[in-house]
Amino acid sequence: MDKKVILISIDGLRPDAVETCGHPFVNTLRENGCYSPDASSVVPPVTLPAHTSIFYSVPPIRHGIITNDYMPPVRPIRGLAEQLERADKTCAAFYGWEPMRHVWTSGNMKYSLFVNEYEEDNSDLLLTQEALSLIERKEPDFVYLYLVET
């Protein structure tokens, strides 16, 4: 079986909070997944610029996203989802904040689900359940789960 990756991003959750929250599930994720207690954000430490940097491996000054307002890049670059697609990997995204869809090219995510956190109670729970269901049914190579109700 090929290795699979699930990237879970919980908006506003600092590394020190992961270590001290004491929740059994968070502890299990930390102990069995990849976690960096020394992680730091980009400047500015704002959601859209930070996640764009995660997906494109460059700072905001290079990708051009410096606020939570999306602007098409002047100098497009190939990002994580594009590289995975070129390697014939199947990608999926589950997210609760609409601007997040800009951190990948829409065609690169074979499966994508947006649940509006402002219109749906428990959007994080719904997204998580849908992600788990898809993982069981389709076994995607890469799953991005963005949780916003923090």
What are these model-predicted stretches?
Residues 10-13, 148:
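DG-centered beta-turn motif at the end of beta-strands
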Residues 2-4, 12-138:
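Active-site-proximal alpha/beta segments of enzymes that process anionic O-linked groups
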Residues 138-150:
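A structural motif
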